[in-house]
């Protein structure tokens, strides 16, 4: 996955910098529902978890940047997360939100001041991937245009290449975990859901009365496998990229209020963000 200084700064500014504001725009009932879905009692508890990992990761990144030794810990994630929530539980909400934002701004400033070469360090990249990039997807409570486009432009553009870089044994292991016979079938599955999501989103935008029936997942997936079975691998890969680019253009042109539509947001979040983590290729 391409982790660069500029992309990291973009995440800190455009994704995390709007994170709280976007959440606050949701109706109160929807806020509570989405926080509970994340497994937290309150939004502040979830932010405390995010904040604690920022602080932990940046401590290590600073040490690497300065050539200092740092403790290599084996984390018990349940304990670490519980301690983070407990630490900030007594804080007044306004005081905590101010602290969260100041920490975000300082983190962005610190990363901006660091040498570009630091972002090539394996441990730095690993921490940034966890606390900046993966955390944005893991704790997705409101979808942004930025995150949607970033996933399509960066992560999905490298998806097939990432699979090809695996050795044959790792490829077999990955497909076995996915319950699929071939990477061809996986691409067919992804393409089909992208196309279905785009069809529904354009229908919603085109007509207030637009309706659709959610497909039976198993039957739809089987249909997609059959639909693209006769396609060559090369043709399917080209079509994958055509559909990906079409999605980029569609998302780029969506009106701002489209992301406040629960159905549009839901389809984009499922197809572009969650789908990526449902079929993760680790290299």
Name each model-derived stretch:
Residues 25, 49, 113, 165, ...:
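Conserved catalytic core of Hanks-type protein kinase domains
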Residues 1-18, 144-161:
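Extreme N-terminal tail/first-helix region
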Residues 32-79, 116-157, 172-219, 253-283:
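Short, contiguous alpha-helical
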Residues 12, 16-19, 57, 100, ...:
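Hydrophobic alpha-helical core bundles mediating ligand binding, dimerization, or RNAP-core interactions
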Residues 16, 26-30, 156-174:
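N-terminal first-folded block
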Residues 81-117, 219-257:
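Acidic/histidine-rich alpha-helical segments that form the ligand environment
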């Amino acid at each position: 996955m391409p982790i660069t200084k500029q992309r990291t700064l973009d995440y800190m500014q455009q994704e995390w910098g709007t994170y709280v504001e976007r959440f606050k725009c949701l109706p109160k009932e929807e806020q509570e529902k989405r926080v509970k879905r994340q497994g937290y009692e309150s939004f502040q508890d979830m932010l405390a978890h995010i904040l604690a990992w920022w602080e932990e990761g940046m401590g290590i990144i600073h040490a690497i940047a300065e050539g200092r030794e740092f403790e290599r810990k084996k984390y018990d994630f349940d304990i670490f997360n519980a301690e983070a929530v407990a630490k900030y539980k007594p804080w007044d909400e306004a005081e905590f939100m101010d602290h969260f934002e100041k920490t975000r701004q300082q983190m962005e400033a610190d990363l901006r001041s660091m040498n570009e070469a630091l972002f090539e360090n394996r441990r730095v990249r690993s921490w940034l991937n966890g606390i900046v990039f993966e955390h944005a997807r893991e704790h997705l409570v409101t979808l942004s245009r930025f995150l949607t486009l970033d996933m399509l432009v960066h992560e999905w553009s490298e998806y097939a290449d990432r699979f090809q870089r695996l050795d044959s044994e790792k490829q077999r292991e990955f497909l076995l975990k996915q319950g699929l016979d071939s990477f061809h079938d996986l691409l067919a599955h992804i393409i089909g859901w992208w196309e279905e999501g785009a069809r529904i989103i354009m229908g919603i935008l085109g007509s207030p009365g637009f309706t659709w029936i959610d497909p039976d997942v198993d039957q739809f997936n089987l249909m997609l496998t059959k639909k693209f079975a006769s396609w060559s691998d090369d043709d399917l890969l080209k079509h994958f990229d055509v559909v990906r680019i079409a999605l980029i253009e569609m998302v780029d042109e969506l009106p701002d209020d489209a992301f406040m539509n629960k159905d549009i947001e839901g389809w984009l979040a499922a197809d572009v963000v969650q789908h990526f983590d449902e079929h993760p290729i680790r290299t």
